[in-house]
Amino acid sequence: MDHIRNFSIIAHIDHGKSTLADRLIQFTGISDERTFKDQMLDNMDIERERGITIKSQAITLPYQAKDGKTYSLNLIDTPGHVDFSYEVSRALASCEGVLLLIDAAQGVQAQTVANLYLAMEHNLEIIPVINKIDLPSADVERVIEQIDDELGLDSEGHLKCSAKAGIGIQDILEAIVKRVPPPRGNPEAPLAALIFDAHYDPFRGTIIHCRIMEGTVKSGDTIRFMSNSATYRVEEVGHFLLQREKRNCLSAGEVGYIIAGVKTVSDVRTGDTITLDDRPCSQPLPGFREVKPVVFASIYPIASDDYDDLKAALEKYQLNDASFIYQKDSSAALGQGFRCGFLGLLHLEVVQERLEREYDQSIILSVPSVRYRFTLKDGSVVYVDNPAHYPGSSSIELSEEPYIRATLMLPERYLGAVMKLCMEKRGVNSTLNYPSPGRVELLYEMPLAEVIYDFYDRFKSVTQGYGSFDYELIDYRESQLVLLDILVNGERVDALSQIVHRDRARARGLQACERLKEEIPRQMFKIAIQGAIGGEIISRTTITPFRKDVIAKCYGGDISRKRKLLEKQKKGKKRMKMIGQVSIPQSAFLSVLKSDAD
């Protein structure tokens, strides 16, 4: 076990994590020029295109150090975006050390700090690495000061590198060997293995990614998942090189995979402990919490016949994404679908895109919402994340919404614009710090519902991309919440209902009405589109009808003839309006649902 090192790379989004992983893979020689491609560990197209890492990946790098010994370095690559911090915490629980990567030009960012605290919670050895030192705008001295002052780490032990140019890679590998402690654990003890990820293979079933903490597992063993006591027989174990590499056994300290013919996707829970059925460990491994979704939205198939296909796609998708939850839902306007929970807006976008690409689904997403808390007059407390379950306003004693504490780091010149944006989003209790000259750290408490709409995009645009943002949920606070309904031709469209703050209701209602007006085709009769709270109409637009020229055939003559024809047309239109159903096209739903996220 002395020759094993388990480490992870943590950084703010875009600080060069995946590029550094590529260089480490190249340097250790497991990838030649022919098989190499950028972002080796980002397997999904969407990860490559957006340049982000979404899923944790593991790979074993054989490295011959300067002391002449060969070490097995297990790299667990982690995502950097705020929505995926649960993936980071899972990966960190499987490691003994981390490389804390900091961009030499941008310096310490909000997510750097958040991930550092996660690493400290797990008591890991932290090696600060300053990346992109070859950039013209790199300011290494300033970053060293930030490591000392803002992060409270000893900057003496920092390393400098340029992952893109391949500078300083060997120093990093040597530092991992020297400074990251070897894993502890007893290969003879009862098996305890931590699941940090899993993915679905149509031929082999579920492939479990795990770190063996204690004991040994080999093919032929019968394993048990401790959270649900499901048992399976192990078919194959091994390490991840660029592909899966079969081994006879995995023992304490190693990172690898287990294939055990697990077909029921829901049995494999990320963060669960695997043990042997005939010789179980006494208690599960600590440190994992149930991941709680933060943003909720409904997903419907565009064609109602595709419901079963969508259900199968969600089941398979959920295996690769432990934090995604869903349950059945139905809507009068859109038919059968699913109510889903996500970690944040980027997570929601990624799920939507992966369902469309990898599983070939055509779907509609409803307006995203958060989980509100209502205390009713009879004293009971209900949590509502779906506007369809909104309790009647007459029965509500107290309505509350979730608040977050946002940490914003930005150059000082954008301070005014960012404070204005936060105030607009109902931000309160601001704290202002100056961690270093020219840089500001802002702390705000604000409603999560305001953040999930367009806060991130607007924050990025007012800071011209130089700001960074991180948040954590704090508590529920009293708020004036109302249910905004959209009526088309007097009929309530349930898929467009949303729970909003009373001050925002009129603007939201008007925005939805205007969007629908652009998308719904004109009919032969007038269509009213209204936004309503309870019985009160707060916004309205009208789609004017087509008009057939019924008096075209009358030349001159008596006006009463024309009047008679016009009256007849008016009666016909009235009758048409009473029985005429307005069909709302899919594009109209998408337009309204997108309007809040744009």
From Swiss-Prot:
EC number of the protein: 3.6.5.n1
Keyword annotations from UniProtKB, A to Z: Cell inner membrane, Cell membrane, GTP-binding, Hydrolase, Membrane, Nucleotide-binding, Protein biosynthesis
Domain tr-type G span(s) in chain numbering: 2-184
Class of the enzyme per the UniProt entry, highest EC level: hydrolase
GO cellular component: plasma membrane
Catalytic reaction annotation: GTP + H2O = GDP + phosphate + H(+)
Pfam families hit by this protein: EFG_C, EFG_III, GTP_EFTU, GTP_EFTU_D2, LepA_C
Subcellular localization: Cell inner membrane
Main location (coarse class): membrane
GO biological process, one term: positive regulation of translation
Physiological role: Required for accurate and efficient protein synthesis under certain stress conditions. May act as a fidelity factor of the translation reaction, by catalyzing a one-codon backward translocation of tRNAs on improperly translocated ribosomes. Back-translocation proceeds from a post-translocation (POST) complex to a pre-translocation (PRE) complex, thus giving elongation factor G a second chance to translocate the tRNAs correctly. Binds to ribosomes in a GTP-dependent manner.
Name of the protein in question: Elongation factor 4
Lineage of the species this protein comes from: Bacteria, Pseudomonadati, Thermodesulfobacteriota, Syntrophia, Syntrophales
